[in-house]
UniProtKB/Swiss-Prot annotation:
Species, as recorded: Enterobacter sp. (strain 638)
Similarity section: Belongs to the DeoC/FbaB aldolase family. DeoC type 2 subfamily.
Catalytic activity as recorded in UniProt: 2-deoxy-D-ribose 5-phosphate = D-glyceraldehyde 3-phosphate + acetaldehyde
Record keywords: Cytoplasm, Lyase, Schiff base
Gene Ontology cellular-component annotations: cytoplasm
Function, in words: Catalyzes a reversible aldol reaction between acetaldehyde and D-glyceraldehyde 3-phosphate to generate 2-deoxy-D-ribose 5-phosphate.
Official protein name in the record: Deoxyribose-phosphate aldolase
SUPFAM superfamilies: Aldolase
Positions annotated as active site in the UniProt record: D102 (proton donor/acceptor), K167 (schiff-base intermediate with acetaldehyde), K201 (proton donor/acceptor)
GO MF annotations, alphabetized: deoxyribose-phosphate aldolase activity
Keyword Lyase carried by entry: yes
Domain of life: Bacteria
Length: 259
């Protein structure tokens, strides 16, 4: 098995296979759930808008893949600083049956100098998730924060407020996951001594088997080869799946999606 083949198989099983488009339909979500079941194993999760959680659950159960988790998004993609709205959306997502919630950190407030609202928003959502045994991922929007100090600060605040994962991006801004931002965020996990309990998710812009290999190599470098399991590492992507499957000898590498 080549290094790229091995990393592709790892990456596939760490994917949050994603569709977060304005024109999403039940049919598109059903198709996504079908794609999550591949000839070489299942993706870790599907990531969809909250209203599609019931149809996703039904589809995943019907095809014999109930272990594929259902992730959804809240405070998305804008990352506003209204805690009550973010919390209400998170509670609604839990009520729909989400296994995991990816909430957008109020990154513009942090850029403006307000650290407290980010902590309070994440903590409120974490408390709701913890009560329901739901995993919380916090999207810090690295491509908008831009500066290393802000990326580091948003990561630290999110972790202190209870994030189970820190995630780079919504996939809805010009710059999404980059190797540079990934390393900064994972260094925070290392430096805070929380690698047992906090994971990392690059999202948006991870499109090829080679991209995935590069991102996994950073995790392996910082934490060793055994750390990046589905509790500690996810890829938020859709078009990546076709590239991984092609590398693994299945399909032509073409995808209908650009996420």
């Amino acid at each position: 098995m080549t290094d790229l083949t091995a990393s592709s198989l790892r990456a596939l099983k760490l994917m949050d296979l994603t569709t977060l488009n304005d024109d999403d339909t039940n049919e598109k979500v059903i198709a996504l759930c079908h794609q999550a079941k591949t000839p070489v194993g299942n993706t870790a999760a599907v990531c969809i808008y909250p209203r599609f959680i019931p149809i996703a659950r039904k589809t995943l159960n019907a095809q014999g893949t109930p272990d594929v988790r259902i992730a959804t998004v809240t405070n998305f993609p804008h990352g506003n600083d209204d805690i009550e709205i973010a919390l209400a959306e998170t509670r609604a997502a839990i009520a729909y049956g989400a296994d995991e919630v990816d909430v957008v950190f109020p990154y513009r407030a942090l850029i403006a100098g307000n650290e407290q609202v980010g902590f309070d928003l994440v903590k409120a959502c974490k408390d709701a998730c913890a009560a329901a045994n739901v995993l919380l991922k916090v999207i810090i929007e690295t491509g908008e924060l831009k500066e290393e100090a802000l990326i580091r600060k948003a990561s630290e605040i999110s972790i202190k407020a209870g994030a189970d994962f820190i995630k780079t991006s919504t996939g809805k801004v010009p710059v999404n996951a980059t190797p540079e931002s990934a390393r900064i965020m994972m260094e925070v996990i290392r430096d805070m001594g929380v690698s047992k309990t906090v994971g990392f998710k690059p999202a948006g812009g991870v499109r090829t088997a080679e991209d995935a290999q590069q991102f996994l190599a950073i995790a392996d470098d910082l934490f060793g080869a055994d750390w990046a399991d589905s509790r500690h590492y996810r890829f938020g992507a859709s078009s990546l799946l076709a590239s991984l499957l092609k590398t693994l000898g299945h399909g032509d590498g073409k995808s209908a999606s650009a996420y």
